[in-house]
A protein has these predicted regions:
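Bilobed "Venus flytrap"/periplasmic-binding protein-like clamshell domains
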Residues: 1-37, 57-59
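Periplasmic-binding protein-like
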Residues: 14-15, 65-119, 122-134
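Soluble non-cytosolic domains of exported or imported proteins
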Residues: 8-12, 35-39, 54-55, 89-97, ...
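A ligand-binding cleft/hinge motif common to bilobed small-molecule-binding domains
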Residues: 17-21, 44-79
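Exported/periplasmic ABC-transporter solute-binding proteins
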Residues: 27-29, 37-40, 50, 71
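Short helix-initiation/N-cap motifs at beta->coil->alpha
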Residues: 31-43, 79-81
């Protein structure tokens, strides 16, 4: 990416990663355009105004599907995140344990992959986060 121009959404995690200079995989010689409207990023890429965009992979995939365009997505993600579910600190019903058990069962029996498969190609790759937060 050295010498290239990358568009990111303003106030998003990709913007933070590119502007902070803390990720050794990203050369310092990258021009970053912070764009408020995510849809403008795709137009800028399609028109050649930027060399790349950094955004959530699922958003890029959905844009490509909806607009019948093809972009190349890098194999290595810029960032892997997990989602959390919050319960009231004083909740004594054990909902957190129950939910963890149900999610574990859904993962084991393939239900999670089946649900993700309705929305994403290669759904199994989105379940490869066992060590996240470890």
């Amino acid at each position: 990416l050295a010498g290239k121009t990358v568009a990111v959404q303003s106030t998003g995690k990709p913007e933070e990663i590119f502007l902070s200079g803390s990720d050794p995989r990203i050369p310092q010689a990258v021009d970053v355009f912070s764009i408020e409207d995510r849809s403008v990023q795709y137009a800028m890429l399609a028109c050649g105004y930027v060399d790349a965009i950094a955004a959530h992979e699922t958003a890029i995939l959905q844009y490509m599907k909806d607009n019948f365009v093809e972009f190349r997505i890098l194999e290595e993600p810029l960032l892997v995140t997990g989602l959390g579910i919050a319960f009231a600190k004083n909740d004594s019903r054990g909902l957190d344990s129950q939910l963890n058990a149900v999610l574990a069962q859904m993962r084991t029996d393939g239900t999670l992959e089946q649900i993700l498969g309705r929305y994403l190609e290669h759904a199994s790759q989105y379940l490869e986060v066992d060590t996240l937060g470890a």
